[in-house]
Amino acid sequence: MPKQKTHRASAKRFKRTGSGGLKRFRAYTSHRFHGKTKKQRRHLRKAGMVHAGDFKRIKAMLTGLK
């Protein structure tokens, strides 16, 4: 049976945390900031965590990620 490979697009978008969770980055951060408030822009800078409902599916794509 061939080796299971890491989904490379997912590996670039998620990082493993020290406690075993998955850190994700927020959407809506590339352009069109003039329509957003300072508070919205500040919150978009922070990374978020992957929700429990998505965790199992994303973890399967990231088999080789340490």
Curated annotation (Swiss-Prot):
Disulfide bonds: none annotated. SUPFAM superfamilies: L35p-like. Transmembrane segments: none annotated. Keywords: Ribonucleoprotein, Ribosomal protein. GO terms for cellular component: cytosolic large ribosomal subunit. Residues 1-16 have a biased composition (Basic residues). Residues 1-21 are annotated as: Disordered. GO terms for biological process: translation. One of its GO terms (molecular function) is structural constituent of ribosome. Pfam families: Ribosomal_L35p. Gene3D superfamilies: 4.10.410.60. Belongs to the bacterial ribosomal protein bL35 family. NCBIfam families: rpmI_bact (TIGR00001). This is Large ribosomal subunit protein bL35. The lineage of its organism: Bacteria, Bacillati, Bacillota, Bacilli, Lactobacillales.
